[in-house]
């Protein structure tokens, strides 16, 4: 694939991409390098304009747990991994810190309230790995061919990632930044 500074489209594994894009925003903020700012801004525009679900979920494809093509946003077969939603929150938070624009918090909140928290049951004991937008009772979207939240997974990144993310919530509730003009 392209070097990060040449990327304009979100591609590949949605979780890893979300973390990489978060890192790009951090590098842009720390160094002030306009090439990183330009690259991450283009990628963000691609995500929010062409690759994000109404829930804030990202990563349309089960194959590769990946972003799909532009506008490839199926409901029934949507992947929208819980960990990808967490990566989306991280990326938008860092972009908010970089730019100070509330549009990033709009995406963060949409993802948090709809695409991320849907990954855990109300009692906190069962989880979704993928988060499809619809269920017909026939398409078994979980890897074990079920259609319900599960107490655990063979690859248990989502439950542990939620456990890591939830304690960080207070830091997202109130964010103050100083922008010098």
Feature-to-residue mapping (PLM):
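Glycan-recognition and catalytic cores of secretory/periplasmic carbohydrate-active enzymes
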Residues: 1-181
């Amino acid at each position: 694939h392209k070097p990060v500074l040449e990327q304009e489209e979100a591609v590949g594994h949605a979780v890893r991409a979300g973390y990489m894009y978060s890192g790009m925003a951090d590098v842009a903020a720390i160094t002030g390098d306009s090439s990183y700012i330009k690259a991450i801004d283009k990628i963000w525009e691609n995500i929010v304009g062409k690759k994000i679900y109404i829930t804030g979920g990202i990563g349309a494809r089960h194959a590769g747990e990946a972003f799909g093509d532009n506008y490839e946003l199926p409901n029934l077969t949507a992947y929208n991994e819980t960990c990808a939603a967490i990566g989306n929150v991280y990326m938008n938070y860092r972009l908010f810190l970089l730019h100070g624009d509330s549009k990033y918090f709009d995406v963060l909140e949409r993802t948090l309230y709809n695409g991320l928290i849907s990954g855990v049951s109300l009692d906190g004991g069962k989880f979704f790995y993928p988060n499809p937008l619809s269920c017909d009772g026939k398409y078994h979207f979980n890897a074990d061919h079920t259609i319900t939240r599960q107490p655990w997974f063979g690859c248990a990144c989502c439950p542990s990632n939620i456990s890591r993310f939830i304690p960080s919530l207070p830091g997202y509730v109130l964010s103050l930044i100083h922008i010098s003009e």
